[in-house]
Amino acid sequence: MKVYIIDYHKDDPKRCTGKKLVKLKIAEFTRVGKGVVLDPFAQITLSNKDKDIVRRIGITIVDTSWNNTSQSEFKNIRGEHRRIPILFAGNPIHYGIAYKLSSIEALIATLYIVDEVEEAIKLSNVVKWGHTFIELNKELLEAYKNKTEEDIKKIEREIIEKILEK
């Protein structure tokens, strides 16, 4: 499975998990989107329908800082733009915050959702807090795994409603 990183050089290089993926030869840098482009602003949610594209072409992660990101950074990237459904960060910088995943967490989530669970778990070993991300989101990841976009959006709405009730 191919993993591509578009690096906008806005992240602290010491904490940048996208660069770490490249350094470990799990991913390679690119300037163009290929396959499924993970885009937090996308209208379409990642689902089992994307499994074939992920396996044949790959996954593109845009590595940028959450503090400086905007929709315009994603606008001109070609590929199948997909949004990861609600999950909570396990990384020390954004721990417990919904949607604010690191590049490696986004990749782990993508692999899990398209039913590449073994690969996702193996990848979680790359960072100290990788297993924390999976444990924190285990129930959600299992609920999203191999589901249609409609099913995933329904689960996501239920989660958001529960959060808003509190």
Curated annotation (Swiss-Prot):
Domain of life, per lineage: Archaea
Pfam family, one: Fer4_RLI
Keyword Coiled coil (UniProt): no
Keyword line: Cytoplasm, Ribosome biogenesis, rRNA processing, S-adenosyl-L-methionine, Transferase
Subcellular location as annotated: Cytoplasm
Cellular component per GO, a single term: cytoplasm
Covalent S-S links between cysteines: none
One Gene Ontology term of the molecular function aspect: rRNA binding
Keyword Transferase: yes
Class in the EC hierarchy, top level: transferase
Binding site residues for S-adenosyl-L-methionine: T17, V62, I84, Y99, S103
Biological process per Gene Ontology, one example term: enzyme-directed rRNA pseudouridine synthesis
Annotated InterPro entries: RNaseL-inhib-like_metal-bd_dom (IPR007209), Tsr3-like (IPR022968), Tsr3_C (IPR007177)
Mutagenesis / variant outcome for changing W66A: Decreased S-adenosyl-L-methionine-binding
EC number: 2.5.1.157
Reactions listed under catalytic activity: an N(1)-methylpseudouridine in rRNA + S-adenosyl-L-methionine = N(1)-methyl-N(3)-[(3S)-3-amino-3-carboxypropyl]pseudouridine in rRNA + S-methyl-5'-thioadenosine + H(+)
Record family assignment: Belongs to the TDD superfamily. TSR3 family.
Function: Aminocarboxypropyltransferase that catalyzes the aminocarboxypropyl transfer on pseudouridine corresponding to position 914 in M.jannaschii 16S rRNA. It constitutes the last step in biosynthesis of the hypermodified N1-methyl-N3-(3-amino-3-carboxypropyl) pseudouridine (m1acp3-Psi).
Record-given protein name: 16S rRNA aminocarboxypropyltransferase
Organism: Saccharolobus solfataricus (strain ATCC 35092 / DSM 1617 / JCM 11322 / P2)
